[in-house]
Regions:
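A short beta-strand-turn-helix
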Residues: 1-14
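Short pre-active-site segment immediately N-terminal to redox-active cysteine/selenocysteine motifs
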Residues: 12-13, 20-23, 66
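Hydrophobic beta-strand anchors of alpha/beta hydrolase catalytic cores
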Residues: 16-17, 47, 70
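ABC family nucleotide-binding domain
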Residues: 18, 31, 35, 61-62
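The canonical Cys-X-X-Cys-His
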Residues: 24-27, 70
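Typically the conserved alpha-helix immediately C-terminal to a functionally engaged Cys/Sec
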Residues: 28-42
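Structural microenvironment flanking redox-active thiols in thiol-disulfide oxidoreductases
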Residues: 52-59
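Non-catalytic, surface beta->alpha helical segment in thiol-disulfide oxidoreductase systems
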Residues: 66-83
Length: 83
């Protein structure tokens, strides 16, 4: 997954990563909002969910210490991150 993740964030198209956990209440609320955002942005950007329990190494590599955490990448650069 790590190589696929790196390919994903190296895209010219912006990528919003939603670092979440299945047990996280606020993550569930945020998920419905992100579905609406995804419908509105269409092909302008990608929105991808990463379960921190399934991929803890990726979460750790990008300094995710709590969920939900959102991060925006473009061309491999982290443009914004918020928990």
């Amino acid at each position: 997954m790590s190589q696929k993740f790196k390919e994903l964030i190296n895209s010219e198209r912006p990528v919003l990563i939603d670092f979440f956990a299945t047990w996280c209440g606020p993550c569930k609320v945020q998920s419905s909002v992100l579905k609406t955002v995804k419908e509105n942005v269409g092909e302008l950007a990608r929105i991808v969910k990463i379960d921190v329990d399934q991929f803890p190494a990726i979460a750790a590599e990008y300094g995710v210490r709590g969920v939900p955490t959102l991060a925006v990448f473009k061309n491999g650069d982290l443009l914004w991150k918020e928990s």
